[in-house]
C-alpha cells in the first residue's frame, strides 16, 4: 500500500480536515480493486465484479451532473472575468456564491472528511507541463479515487516526489447542506468552486463526472485568458500527422468516432490547442455504454476490463452485463485509462495543429444533412449556436431527445463568455488553415438514427480529403453546402429532403428548426461581431 509517501495529516489540516490517521496516497489499481470489493462496504461505496474483469458501481439518484447545483464564489478574482448566470443575455450554470456561504459549505465537507480513512490522488489535468493543473483529489470513497486515477494524467514517481497541488478537490458526497433554503441555493446538494482558494467542494452527489467536468471548467477559465483554445472535443491523428478534432455534446459521437482503428487517439473529450498543437487534458476516457456492442464498437468494448470502472450498468447475478438495460439511466458509463485503447498517441497525448474541425450534432428534428462543409462565418455561427438534441440521461430529468443550444458545444463547462472561445478557436484555425464541417449523427425523415456505418464513411471522406473535392449543392433555408455523393455513403441520405415522404414535410420541420436557431442567436447580437454573423445562419 502506498500510504503517505510524504503526505502528512498536517497537510490535510491546512485544508481544514482534521484527525486523519490513515491516508491512502495514490493507491495502486490492485489496492483500489480490493478496496472497492470489500464485503464490509455498504450502499454506493460497494462495487460489484463483472465477468469482463471491471468493477461496476452505482451512483444513486445522481446518474448525471447536477448543473443546477453548480456555484462559483464571486469575489475580486472572478467578478469581472467569469460568465455569470445573472448577467447578460446568455443562460449558463455559473451561479454566484458568496464567500460566507462558501465557508459554510467548506465546513460541511471538511467535517465529513475529518477523522476518516481518506484516499488522496495527485494527478495532472493537461498534457503540457507549461499549462497543466496539478490537482489533489481527496475522498473517503475508494471508487471515486479509482475514477480520478482513470480520468486524469497519472504522474511518474519523480513527478509525485515534487508534486505541489495548484487545485484541491474535496469530495464529500455523503454530506448535504441543510441550510440551502435560507442561503438561496437550489437544493441540499452542491458543486462549488473558489478560484481564489483554488478549490472545488462536492456535497450530496456521488456522480464521478462532477470531478472530471469540474476541472474542465477550471481549464476553460485559465487557458483562453492565455490565448490557448480550450475545447469540449475529441481528437485523433492520422498516419501523416494530420489532426482532426470532433466537437459535440454528450452522446453525439465524440468518443465513438474518434476511436478509429485507422488513426491514433489523442483523447475523447477535453483538449487544448496552443502554439505547438492539440493536447489532451485527460489520462482516460469516459464512454457511454448504453446499447454497447462488441461488433459496433470493438475498441470501447475491449477497453472494459480489469482497472476500468463501470457506472450504473445492470449486472446480472452471474456477473454478465446487460448493456441494453437503461432502467437506472440512459447515461450508463465506463471510465478507463487511455492505454486501454491500443491505438493511442504515446507517450504524451498531444499532436500537431488540427486541419479538420468537425462539429457533431444529433438533430432530433431530422432536418440537417448528414454532412456539410462550412464557410468561415458559418463555422463561428454553428460553434456559438452549439445545436444538438439533448440525449437521454446525461443530466437528471431528461429522458427523450429534446433540442438544445449549448454554446461552443459545451456551455455547461464554459467559464468565460462564449465569444472568447470562438475568437481563440478561429485564430487557431486560421493559423493552421483548418476547415470545419457540420456532421449530423442524429435522425432523418425515416425516423431512424443515421447509422454509425454511414457516419464513419462520412468522417473518412472528410479526413481523406474526398469531401473537399466532391461536387456540392446548397440546402435552402440553412444555406449549407452538401456533397452530391461520397464513397461508401448511401447517396439518398445526403439530401435530408429525400428521406421524407414529401419535401413539404421537411420544409415544415425546417422552418421550426430555423426559427429556433434564429431566436437562440439573438443573444449574440448585442455586439457588432455577433450581428455580422447572423447572415451565416438560417433564413426564413
Curated annotation (Swiss-Prot):
Pathway: Carbohydrate biosynthesis; gluconeogenesis
Main location as per UniProt: cytoplasm
Catalytic activity: oxaloacetate + ATP = phosphoenolpyruvate + ADP + CO2
N6-acetyllysine PTM positions: 87, 523
Cofactor note: Binds 1 Mn(2+) ion per subunit.
Binding residues for substrate: 65, 207, 213, 333
Subcellular location: Cytoplasm
Cellular component, GO annotation: cytosol
GO biological process: one example: gluconeogenesis
Keywords: Acetylation, ATP-binding, Cytoplasm, Decarboxylase, Gluconeogenesis, Lyase, Manganese, Metal-binding, Nucleotide-binding
MF terms in GO: ATP binding; metal ion binding; phosphoenolpyruvate carboxykinase (ATP) activity
Family per similarity comment: Belongs to the phosphoenolpyruvate carboxykinase (ATP) family.
Name this polypeptide is given: Phosphoenolpyruvate carboxykinase (ATP)
Organism the protein comes from: Shigella flexneri serotype 5b (strain 8401)
Lineage: Bacteria, Pseudomonadati, Pseudomonadota, Gammaproteobacteria, Enterobacterales
Encoding gene per record: pckA
Amino acid at each position: 500500500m502506498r500510504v503517505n509517501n510524504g503526505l502528512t495529516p498536517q497537510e490535510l489540516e491546512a485544508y481544514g480536515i482534521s484527525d486523519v490517521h490513515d491516508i491512502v496516497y495514490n493507491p495502486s489499481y490492485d489496492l483500489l480493486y480490493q478496496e472497492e470489493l470489500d464485503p464490509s462496504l455498504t450502499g454506493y461505496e460497494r462495487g460489484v465484479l463483472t465477468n469482463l474483469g471491471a468493477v461496476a458501481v452505482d451512483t444513486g439518484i445522481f446518474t448525471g451532473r447536477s448543473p443546477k447545483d453548480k456555484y462559483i464564489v464571486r469575489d475580486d478574482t472572478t467578478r469581472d472575468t467569469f460568465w455569470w448566470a445573472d448577467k447578460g443575455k446568455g443562460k449558463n450554470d455559473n451561479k454566484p456564491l458568496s464567500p460566507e456561504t462558501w465557508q459554510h459549505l467548506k465546513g460541511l465537507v471538511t467535517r465529513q472528511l475529518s477523522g476518516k480513512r481518506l484516499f488522496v490522488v495527485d494527478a495532472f489535468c493537461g498534457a503540457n507541463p507549461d499549462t497543466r493543473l496539478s490537482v489533489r483529489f481527496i475522498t473517503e470513497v475508494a471508487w471515486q479515487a479509482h475514477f480520478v486515477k482513470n480520468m486524469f494524467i497519472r504522474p511518474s514517481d519523480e513527478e509525485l516526489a515534487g508534486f505541489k497541488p495548484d487545485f484541491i478537490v474535496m469530495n464529500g458526497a455523503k454530506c448535504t447542506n441543510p441550510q440551502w433554503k435560507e442561503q438561496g441555493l437550489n437544493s441540499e446538494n452542491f458543486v462549488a468552486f473558489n478560484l481564489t482558494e483554488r478549490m472545488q467542494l462536492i456535497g450530496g452527489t456521488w456522480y464521478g463526472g462532477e470531478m472530471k467536468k469540474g476541472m474542465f471548467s477550471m481549464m476553460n477559465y485559465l487557458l483562453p485568458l492565455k490565448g490557448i483554445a480550450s475545447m469540449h472535443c475529441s481528437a485523433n491523428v492520422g498516419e501523416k500527422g494530420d489532426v482532426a478534432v470532433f466537437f459535440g455534446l454528450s452522446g453525439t459521437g465524440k468518443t465513438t468516432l474518434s476511436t478509429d482503428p485507422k488513426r491514433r487517439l489523442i483523447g475523447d473529450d477535453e483538449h487544448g490547442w496552443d502554439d505547438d498543437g492539440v493536447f489532451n487534458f485527460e489520462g482516460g476516457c469516459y464512454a457511454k455504454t448504453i446499447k454497447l456492442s462488441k461488433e459496433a464498437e470493438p475498441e470501447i468494448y475491449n477497453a472494459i476490463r480489469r482497472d476500468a470502472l463501470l457506472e450504473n450498468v445492470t449486472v446480472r447475478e452471474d456477473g454478465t452485463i446487460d448493456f441494453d438495460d437503461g432502467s437506472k439511466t440512459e447515461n450508463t458509463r465506463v471510465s478507463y485509462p487511455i492505454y486501454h485503447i491500443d491505438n493511442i498517441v504515446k507517450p504524451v497525448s498531444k499532436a500537431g495543429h488540427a486541419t479538420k474541425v468537425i462539429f457533431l450534432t444529433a438533430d432530433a428534428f431530422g432536418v440537417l444533412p448528414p454532412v456539410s462543409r462550412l464557410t468561415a462565418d458559418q463555422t463561428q455561427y454553428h460553434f456559438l449556436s452549439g445545436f444538438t438534441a439533448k440525449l437521454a440521461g446525461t443530466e437528471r430529468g431528461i429522458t427523450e431527445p429534446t433540442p438544445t443550444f449549448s454554446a461552443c458545444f459545451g456551455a455547461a463547462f464554459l467559464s468565460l463568455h462564449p465569444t472568447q472561445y470562438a475568437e481563440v478557436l478561429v485564430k487557431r484555425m486560421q493559423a493552421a488553415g483548418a476547415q470545419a464541417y457540420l456532421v449530423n449523427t442524429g435522425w432523418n425523415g425515416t425516423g431512424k438514427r443515421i447509422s454509425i456505418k454511414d457516419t464513419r464513411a462520412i468522417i473518412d471522406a472528410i479526413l481523406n480529403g474526398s469531401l473537399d473535392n466532391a461536387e456540392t449543392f446548397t440546402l435552402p433555408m440553412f444555406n449549407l453546402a452538401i456533397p452530391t455523393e461520397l464513397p461508401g455513403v448511401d447517396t439518398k441520405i445526403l439530401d435530408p429532403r429525400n428521406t421524407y415522404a414529401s419535401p413539404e414535410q421537411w420544409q415544415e420541420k425546417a422552418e421550426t428548426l430555423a426559427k429556433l436557431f434564429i431566436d437562440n442567436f439573438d443573444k449574440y447580437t448585442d455586439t457588432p461581431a455577433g450581428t455580422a454573423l447572423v447572415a451565416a445562419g438560417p433564413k426564413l
